[in-house]
């Protein structure tokens, strides 16, 4: 009885401490935003332009600092500014909310600092109960295809007066682009079927057309600016999209087209058969598309080669299918080379690279992909992919964060909208998966095809990054889905230490090829969560810079963790383990002067996680052909910096108190002997003597100190 009372008391104490820490961390956004709003906006020195005088001399001309005039959305057509005063910036705002105190000054200084931009928008949030700032919408940089699907610009935008005047002639074009049919301002007819279109939406579209914002970029320079700061607090009753939300819609082709579908496949006859049959049955014969298919096989056994040939010969040539070409050659698996071989042996105007474990579900999917790929400014086009037999998302676009490229919304349910409609409609992303990737042959040739030095991983990402750097906008069509039987093509990389090592090596090649994209993704705000792939898209919730996290001291356990039990119920996710310099500056940073950094999450399945205290574990291992094994019982343990992880709570709604399951650990250079260390975790029950230990395949390399 006494033992139970003591345990109950300890449990309640642990939960109180947990709740107190959780309340502090979950209020971090409101606190962070209020701190920003108190800061003074730094003045920017106006740039100087030069004019050529009568005698050829250069005459300096300091650009004027503009005045900002705030205009409500309801009065956008009432501006009478025939001259287009160069010294004036118009800031258009929704009446449903308020600008921050800094907003006008931030906008003014932005235009001073960026003479190349004539139009800009920014981020916003919502005012909740008690005036608390909640639900921030951290928007992407200019995304033309996202904009045509939804008015993601939201509650405010600004432009130079001169551009407002010059864009007036684009009104009819803007209305047509947004789905309207009329040509009279302020009339119900002006928006046709899109009766909810806002006048401000039409005006913004006019400005974007004037700025050539629906054309291919010059490199990575964007034609419209984006201020990555919340400058507007929206009223809770106001829809952020003002009626034009991300939505499903049917698109028509610009003109009929030919498509070559390239499918790498080996020893998967039944899988490939399902894929081919689904393609034929869901591609309508009146879609304006004719297509051929190339199956590229790098080494199926004799029996499966026969099976391939038999069912390929039985696939009916209907609904636009002209032929299926089976290309066989025994060689090492190289996804890039197989894709390139397929492209060389086909002649379609467009190339669709498709995994053999893809199943097409509904008619119209190829038309939708092609309608985007036909746009001159669009590079690669992908589709939302769901896991089989359910609504779990496998892919909805790639985000490029500090730990590298990740799938957005992976393993989130598609039965509801996530983060302002990200899994709905059409979105510009920095990349899409090669499991389903459509591109024009000309653009494919322009970038030299797939990189054959990346044989297994990141080849599709490199392909998309190159397109982005060339100025194209990549697109993910999240208004429909295909099924992806992922991992049938090859084993999951996280299951084998050797595969993880290969994955890491190819990831380093990727970042060396694109050093300017380390932790840079114009379509995924730096204020959004950058943690594990199987999470929601949510605002970043820990605003403590990694530099401010203290270094952890090591406790040495010569004989291992005594009285502990190794148990798989202690789950560990290791999202980064490497040098702190690599984390901060990318894989090109070769030093280790700042020490080492590890981050991720861990939790105990089926238990109240508020009662557990966790410590990171490292043990020296020896690597061999079978992976890695411990060289002795010695274990090093480290206290962790507890991270707030609401994404884990969203994903694991059946688990108790998993909000604070994140961990971060910094280790000083020279603290550990050089070698390879396996990552693990210790979870100690604060209400009993229970100690749980588990290990993951992740290996941290400690380099010799120089």
Predicted regions: what is each one?
Residues 2-65, 237-260, 315, 389, ...:
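C-terminal, non-catalytic tails of nucleotide-sugar-dependent glycosyltransferases
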Residues 60-64, 113, 277-290:
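Short, acidic, metal-binding catalytic loop of nucleotide-sugar glycosyltransferases
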Residues 61, 255, 543-706:
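Basic, ligand-binding patches in group-transfer machinery
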């Amino acid at each position: 009885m006494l033992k139970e009372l003591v345990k109950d008391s300890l449990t309640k104490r642990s939960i109180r401490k947990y709740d107190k820490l959780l309340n502090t961390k979950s209020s971090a956004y409101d606190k962070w935003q209020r701190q920003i709003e108190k800061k003074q906006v730094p003045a920017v020195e106006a740039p100087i332009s030069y004019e050529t005088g009568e005698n050829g001399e250069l005459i300096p001309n300091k650009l004027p600092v503009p005045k900002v005039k705030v205009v409500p959305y309801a009065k956008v057509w009432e501006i009478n500014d025939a001259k287009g005063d160069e010294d004036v910036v118009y800031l258009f705002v929704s009446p449903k909310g308020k600008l921050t105190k800094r907003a006008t000054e931030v906008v003014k200084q932005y235009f001073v600092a960026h003479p190349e931009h004539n139009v800009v928008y920014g981020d916003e949030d919502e005012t909740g109960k008690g005036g608390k700032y909640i639900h921030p919408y951290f928007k992407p940089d200019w995304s033309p295809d996202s904009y045509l699907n939804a008015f993601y610009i939201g509650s405010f935008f600004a432009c130079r007066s001169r551009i407002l005047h010059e864009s007036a002639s684009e009104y009819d074009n803007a209305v047509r682009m947004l789905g309207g049919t009329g040509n009279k301002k302020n009339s119900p007819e002006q928006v046709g079927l899109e009766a909810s279109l806002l006048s401000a939406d039409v005006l913004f579209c006019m400005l974007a057309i004037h700025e050539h914002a629906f054309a291919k970029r010059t490199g990575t320079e964007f034609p419209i600016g984006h201020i990555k700061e919340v400058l507007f607090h929206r009223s809770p009753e106001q829809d952020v999209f003002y009626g034009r939300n991300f939505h499903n819609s049917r698109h028509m082709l610009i003109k009929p087209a030919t498509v070559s579908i390239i499918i790498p496949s080996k020893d998967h006859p039944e899988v490939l058969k399902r894929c081919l049959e689904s393609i034929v049955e869901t591609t309508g014969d009146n879609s304006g598309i004719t297509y051929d298919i190339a199956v590229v096989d790098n080494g199926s056994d004799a029996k499966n080669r026969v099976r391939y040939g038999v069912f390929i010969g039985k696939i009916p040539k209907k609904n636009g299918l002209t032929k299926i070409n089976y290309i066989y050659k025994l060689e090492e698996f190289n996804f890039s080379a197989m894709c390139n071989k397929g492209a060389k042996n086909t002649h379609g105007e467009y190339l669709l690279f498709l995994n053999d474990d893809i199943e097409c579900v509904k008619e119209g999917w190829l038309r939708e992909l092609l309608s985007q790929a036909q746009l001159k400014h669009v590079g690669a086009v992908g589709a939302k992919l769901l896991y089989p037999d359910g609504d779990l998302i496998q892919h909805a676009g790639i985000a490029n964060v500090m730990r590298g490229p990740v799938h957005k919304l992976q393993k989130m349910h598609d039965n509801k909208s996530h983060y302002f409609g990200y899994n709905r409609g059409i979105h510009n992303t920095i990349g899409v998966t090669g499991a389903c990737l459509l591109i024009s042959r000309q653009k494919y040739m322009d970038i030299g095809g797939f990189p054959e030095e990346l044989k297994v991983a990141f080849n599709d990402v490199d392909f998309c990054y190159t397109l982005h750097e060339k100025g194209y906008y990549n697109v993910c069509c999240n208004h429909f889905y295909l099924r992806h039987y992922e991992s049938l093509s090859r084993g999951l990389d996280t299951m084998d230490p050797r595969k993880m090592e290969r994955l890491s090596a190819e990831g380093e090649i990727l970042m060396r090829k694109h050093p300017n994209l380390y932790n840079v993704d114009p379509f995924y705000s730096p204020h959004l969560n950058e943690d594990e792939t199987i999470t929601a898209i949510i605002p970043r919730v820990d605003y403590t810079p990694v530099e401010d996290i203290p270094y952890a001291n090591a406790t040495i356990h010569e004989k291992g963790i005594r009285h502990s039990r190794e148990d798989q119920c202690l789950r560990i996710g290791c999202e980064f383990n490497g040098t702190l310099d690599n984390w901060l500056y990318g894989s090109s940073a070769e030093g280790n002067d700042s020490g080492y950094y590890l981050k991720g999450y861990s939790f105990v399945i089926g238990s109240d996680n508020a009662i557990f205290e966790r410590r990171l574990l490292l043990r020296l291992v020896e690597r061999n052909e079978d992976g890695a094994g411990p060289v002795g019982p010695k274990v090093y343990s480290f206290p962790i910096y507890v991270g707030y992880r609401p994404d884990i709570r969203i994903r694991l709604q059946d688990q108790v108190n998993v909000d604070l399951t994140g961990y971060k650990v910094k280790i000083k250079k020279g603290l550990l002997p050089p070698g390879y260390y396996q990552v693990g975790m210790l979870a100690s029950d604060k209400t009993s003597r229970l100690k749980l230990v588990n290990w993951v395949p992740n290996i941290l390399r400690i380099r010799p100190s120089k």
